[in-house]
């Protein structure tokens, strides 16, 4: 039997989401891709920076997820910013609907990765940070960095 690939298979990250939101829960979901989008994503041509997800008619869609057209794709390329359906179980969609019906909650894709040769999206239930929360997080990060430097210099 072949060994499972234990490498980091992350194809795209949304690091800005960790800065702009408090992440409450995460869900793993498949994504419906067409044409040459898989090849383009595997080449690292995906961007999750301003992406979000919405629930419409009992289905979850990823919006503003930019997948650049595949270079050799010619007529099979599709719109780079099209809405892509995310594949979740009905019970998971109902949970997400419960979260997003509350004020301040949103769905944010935070990672695109490969799992068993399939492209998956890590979808997070998130609450937006206020500006003072962002400043506090930066101060905390700087303090942690200073402590690590001091510990390293004392060795």
Swiss-Prot record:
Record has Cytoplasm as a keyword: yes
Broad class of where this protein is predominantly found: cytoplasm
One GO cellular component, as annotated: cytosol
Alphabetical GO biological process terms: trans-translation
UniProt GO MF annotations: RNA binding
Keywords, sorted A to Z: Cytoplasm, RNA-binding
PROSITE patterns: SSRP
Subcellular location: Cytoplasm
A Pfam family hit: SmpB
Family the UniProt entry places it in: Belongs to the SmpB family.
Function in brief: Required for rescue of stalled ribosomes mediated by trans-translation. Binds to transfer-messenger RNA (tmRNA), required for stable association of tmRNA with ribosomes. tmRNA and SmpB together mimic tRNA shape, replacing the anticodon stem-loop with SmpB. tmRNA is encoded by the ssrA gene; the 2 termini fold to resemble tRNA(Ala) and it encodes a 'tag peptide', a short internal open reading frame. During trans-translation Ala-aminoacylated tmRNA acts like a tRNA, entering the A-site of stalled ribosomes, displacing the stalled mRNA.
Protein name: SsrA-binding protein
